[in-house]
Amino acid sequence: MMHNQGNSNGDPAAPMSNLQEPQVPMLSQTPNPVPMMNAPAPLLRPAIPGARGARPPRLGLAIPPSPNVKPVGGNAAGPPLQVPSRPPLPVLHLATPMGSTVAPQEHQPNRGAQPGQSASGGSESSAAHSRTGSFGPLDGRGSNPTSAGSQYSALSFASQYGLGGAKPHGTPDPVSAVGSLYSNASEGGVGMEREGSMHGLEASFDKMSLEKARTSDAEDLDDEGWRIVSMENRIVELGGLGEGAGGAVTRCKLKGGKTVFALKVITTNPDPDIKKQILREINFNKGCASEHICRYYGGFLDPSTATISIAMEFCEGGSLDSIYKEVKRLGGRTGEKVLGKIAEGVLQGLTYLEAKRILHRDIKPSNILLCRNGEVKLCDFGVSGDFGTKGEANTFIGTSYYMAPERITGQTYTITSDVWSTGVTLLEVAQHRFPFPADGTEMQPRAGLIDLLTYIVQQPIPKLKDEPEAGIFWSDNFKHFIEACLEKNPKRRGMPWKMLEHPWMTELKTKRVNMSKYLTQVWGWDDPKGSK
């Protein structure tokens, strides 16, 4: 046996041309001769067992090769690769034949299918089924799921066999590779209309509901009818009425209808508390039947815009906030008798709410509406709430500037907190400015919220004062009424029904006030309609 002494240092990269191969005598007594080495040589790797003959040792990877894979560097030709070919059309089976009503069991092989292959052409192994519902090619080894670019993906099958233009019938299989490309009412999988929708409203609503919605005006529609008129695009916008934190309000009417209504569009909020407030407003208004509560017509959800629309009574006179600011712009002042009618309407509305065990919690000029004939109505019950058996609540909801001191300090409160807000509102309209601070200085009340709330709690209440330089004088009864509303001790503050018995209120009930004429003068209407 020849021993390569020049390569005994274990370096296979040493040049071979400068080495000599001396003849070493063989020991015939030893059947397995061992090469003689002068000194141990450092090894770069573990020795590969087995006789290698005269070939120099090669470096190898320490990771054993897979038994199913050809060894690295081997010269032996492996078996021919199985290249998947497009199966014949008769052999191709979609997971659920369109028209079948029974969904097949996933990974259940077809009796006529070859071993290792499902009826749809994929592996019967659960590993061969991808999350997107496509199947990998078969290679006899239970291959892993292929990527979205595989030639055997759902899109490839559909394009190869012209399946894109087919109109399937029946229930699509949720695990079908091609069934997800279709909807039951469109081609190419574009439409998302549900099965059995009959291409329109007829599937979602019965004929009687459709006929009623198409022949009714806004006052006679229920919530289902409002959804129908919304889907049929029968709501016509006539103009904007304003925007606020709660949403935008537009003046609308239905096609073919006569009733003009206000449509309040609210963008839904993921906060569950906000959703509860919106639902509370809708549900409460459904049961209201008072001339001093803004009438509710209905509401609907628009899934395409994620908004809630609330249709309510349109009050042509506008809000008290817009009215008194217009009077101020014109250089006038709202009279005491008009203020008395406004106070009466607000207290009547609060009395109705108290009977229903409801707190408004957001009385302010912008939430008091006037109709063209002068009727006073409360609106915006998004922050309204039920109170308990003692008539108390303890949540901090509403506009902070008009809150009663007990609400600002976090104490329990009752319906009398709305009486405080009524007094602040009347004082603001009478003076043409927000009543805090009481001395009339501009303390940036809307900017410094903490300072303002501290002032309301700690400082004396503002009082209604005469303005001799402007020729404005208020009655003593009116001044006392404001003081009674702004009583800081809630236990001494009057209930709404009790405030209706105040001498100022009983005195004004005997006087006739033409509220319609007042609004006509404010807004410059040509032909006043109605009077009160």
Swiss-Prot record:
<keyword id="KW-0723">Serine/threonine-protein kinase</keyword>
<dbReference type="GO" id="GO:0004672">
    <property type="term" value="F:protein kinase activity"/>
</dbReference>
<keyword id="KW-0808">Transferase</keyword>
<dbReference type="InterPro" id="IPR000719">
    <property type="entry name" value="Prot_kinase_dom"/>
</dbReference>
<dbReference type="InterPro" id="IPR017441">
    <property type="entry name" value="Protein_kinase_ATP_BS"/>
</dbReference>
<dbReference type="InterPro" id="IPR050915">
    <property type="entry name" value="MAP_kinase_kinase"/>
</dbReference>
<keyword id="KW-0749">Sporulation</keyword>
<dbReference type="GO" id="GO:0000165">
    <property type="term" value="P:MAPK cascade"/>
</dbReference>
<dbReference type="InterPro" id="IPR011009">
    <property type="entry name" value="Kinase-like_dom_sf"/>
</dbReference>
<feature type="active site" description="Proton acceptor">
    <location>
        <position position="362"/>
    </location>
</feature>
<dbReference type="GO" id="GO:0005524">
    <property type="term" value="F:ATP binding"/>
</dbReference>
<dbReference type="InterPro" id="IPR008271">
    <property type="entry name" value="Ser/Thr_kinase_AS"/>
</dbReference>
<comment type="function">
    <text>Mitogen-activated protein kinase kinase, part of the mkh1-mkk1-spm1 MAPK cascade that regulates regulates vegetative growth, conidial formation, colony surface hydrophobicity, osmotic stress, cell wall integrity maintenance, carbon and nitrogen source utilization, chitin distribution, septa formation, and pathogenicity.</text>
</comment>
<feature type="binding site">
    <location>
        <position position="264"/>
    </location>
    <ligand>
        <name>ATP</name>
    </ligand>
</feature>
<protein>
    <recommendedName>
        <fullName>Mitogen-activated protein kinase kinase mkk1</fullName>
        <ecNumber>2.7.11.24</ecNumber>
    </recommendedName>
</protein>
<keyword id="KW-0067">ATP-binding</keyword>
<keyword id="KW-0418">Kinase</keyword>
<keyword id="KW-0547">Nucleotide-binding</keyword>
<comment type="similarity">
    <text>Belongs to the protein kinase superfamily. STE Ser/Thr protein kinase family. MAP kinase kinase subfamily.</text>
</comment>
<dbReference type="Pfam" id="PF00069">
    <property type="entry name" value="Pkinase"/>
</dbReference>
<feature type="binding site">
    <location>
        <begin position="241"/>
        <end position="249"/>
    </location>
    <ligand>
        <name>ATP</name>
    </ligand>
</feature>
<feature type="domain" description="Protein kinase">
    <location>
        <begin position="235"/>
        <end position="505"/>
    </location>
</feature>
<keyword id="KW-0183">Conidiation</keyword>
<keyword id="KW-0843">Virulence</keyword>
